[in-house]
Swiss-Prot record:
Gene3D superfamilies xrefs: 3.40.190.80, Fructose-1,6-Bisphosphatase, subunit A, domain 1
Catalytic activity: beta-D-fructose 1,6-bisphosphate + H2O = beta-D-fructose 6-phosphate + phosphate
Protein name: Fructose-1,6-bisphosphatase class 1
Cofactor note: Binds 2 magnesium ions per subunit.
């Protein structure tokens, strides 16, 4: 089986970008080890702190963030990083040409129950001649030069693209290397699976409520077929299922907290996942517009997300076209 770095070179990826990806995979291996140690490593449970999102930090949130931040800022090819766990960007002492945004541990509420979690990352080029500031990161998803995630499940898997195919690598624990196990992930155009947090149904806007209601009616409803619902409470796990076998994943606008009507962050969650889904043949939108076209207004901006099998995303968007935006 091919290893990660030789595969990237065969794809004609630049050595500077390979260096950044290599740094991420080194951090991911350490995070994977800590996770698999579980209670033995004393890293389960929560801290007493909250991150910039107002969310209580898990101990492993802090560990994963520190690992990624430290290693990336040591890279000569990284100029600055942005993280879910950091209030603002963190500048490197080096004059690298890449910017890295990441969610160090997506789905961290699953840690204490031994559920699936993951690391999501986005790599952008530093705009030439621009002073170091948050504005450097405010680029649309289509500007990404690479995107991916690491899923820490029964196996640790790296799923990524440098703008070509979406490749899947599995960590071989015996040699400590990510080996290529899937040359080209392709999302089926049609599906009978969807993933959504149904507990928020009463707070949804009309388009998504109508869409999900029709799915639940199955063969007797307007869709004329039965659908299965899946929900892992971790974007990485739910999107990995979509990339592996198709489906639709959505975390829509809701009215629970008017000041925070969206859940997922554009820069380091929605945009990198959108790049992966599109490169695997799917579609990714906010219900109205292509996610890859949206320019962030700040690094922690949140958005509505609908992504997955292309034909099913189109159907969901048709429901949205029948109603005005709720925001």
């Amino acid at each position: 089986m091919k290893r990660l770095l030789p595969t990237l070179r065969a794809d004609q990826t630049s050595e500077s970008l390979i260096s950044v990806i290599n740094t991420i995979q080194i951090a991911a291996k350490e995070i994977s080890f800590r996770l698999h140690q579980g209670a033995l490593a004393g890293v389960l449970g929560s801290t007493l702190d909250e991150n910039i999102q107002g969310e209580t930090q898990k101990k492993l949130d802090v560990v994963a963030n520190q690992l990624l931040k430290t290693l990336l800022l040591e890279s000569p090819n990284v100029h600055a990083v942005a993280s879910e766990e950091e209030d603002s960007i963190v500048e490197s002492p080096n004059s690298g040409h890449y910017l890295v945004a990441f969610d160090p541990l997506d789905g961290s509420s699953n840690i204490d129950i031994n559920g699936g979690v993951g690391t999501i990352f986005s790599i952008l080029r530093k705009p030439e001649g621009e002073e170091t500031s948050e504005n450097m990161f405010l680029q649309p998803g289509k500007a990404q030069v690479a995107a991916g995630y690491v899923l820490y499940g029964p196996a640790t898997m790296l799923v990524m693209t440098t703008g070509k195919a979406v490749r899947i690598y599995t960590l071989d624990q015996t040699v400590g290397e990510f080996l290529l196990t899937h040359e080209k992930a392709e999302i089926p155009k049609d599906t009978k699976e969807f993933a959504i947090n149904m507990s928020n149904r009463r707070h949804w806007a009309d388009p998504i409520r109508a869409y999900i209601s029709d799915l639940l009616e199955g063969e007797e409803g307007p869709r004329g077929k039965n659908f299965n619902m899946r929900w892992n409470a971790a974007m990485v796990s739910d999107v990995h299922r979509v990339i592996s076998r198709g489906g639709l994943f959505t975390y829509p606008w809701d009215a629970r907290k008017p000041e925070k009507p969206f859940k997922l962050r554009l820069l380091y969650e929605a945009a990198p996942m959108a790049m992966l889904v599109e490169k695997a043949g799917g579609k990714a939108t906010d219900g109205y517009s292509r996610l890859m076209e949206i320019v962030p207004e700040h690094i922690h901006q949140r958005v509505s997300v609908v992504m997955g099998s292309a034909n099913e995303v189109d159907v969901c968007m048709d429901y949205h076209k029948q109603h005005p935006k709720p925001y």
